[in-house]
Amino acid sequence: MTGWPTEPDLRATHHATQALAQRLRLPFRSQTWRGQVGNWIGAGVGSSIDFQDHRPYLPGDDPRHIDWRAYGRTGHYIMKLYREEVTPLVDVALDLSDSMLFDDAKRTRTAELLYFSLESARQSDASLRLFAVRGPHWVPWELASILAYRPPVFADTATGAHEPPVLRNIPWRTGALRVFISDLLFAGSPEPLLQPLTGGKGRGLIFAPYCRAEASPDWAGDIEFVDCENGHRQIQHIESRLLRRYEDAYRRHHELWREHCQKRAVTLARVAAEQPLAATLQAEALPVGAVELWV
């Protein structure tokens, strides 16, 4: 893997996203959570101070939750029910295809989305796991390594590295918010990537960074193109008609992803690289529910 930001750049990115996560975060409040004990309202009953309802006492119930006032009125043991308090689960997978790193602004935005997701989870006391994906290969990315601004280490970066990312082998946790950061610039149906994001009661969310160079290029005349995935070079004469064909194909590709995400109930937010992160998240991610205001 080449082109990962330097340690000073990552340190600055991390510092900025720490501040941003105090105003915007991943959509925790809009979810109903199940999981280990924590600070978030869950789907079941538990022992928080948030009193919810009554039910008759059953053998094995905690007698500390008996409503003695109700017993005095009715002569029956009545249990107080409380909302369960749980810890949200957040699994983040970062696509490290070369197309994510070829452009300076896009590379920075990719790192910003990673550290924003990380800080959203940490500042919300969520249980966090991170993975790096490159073609069919994935590795767990230890939090300590990310906080030390070290890139992930793949045992094999050559075989299949230029293929679309494979998510089905990642050990996603049941009921987790599954965040996939990828530009989605690979051919084929979106379904093989979307199914792992929603299986096992998962909640899928995709941040798709993009840059002006790919979305609205200013090509004209003879242009030398370099495939950032395999290094292949080709000189192509670009005229306005060919440029429009490219722009139409690019637009249709992302419309296809949007349609499939809607069918799968996966939240998709495309995130422009040239604007400040806070501005583009508010403009593009907030309206679709990929982030929420934190006040």
Task: Give residue ranges: language-model regions.
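Exposed, interaction-prone extracellular/peripheral surfaces
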Residues: M1-A43, P56-R64, A70, G75, ...
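Charged, amphipathic alpha-helical linkers/stalks
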Residues: I49-D50
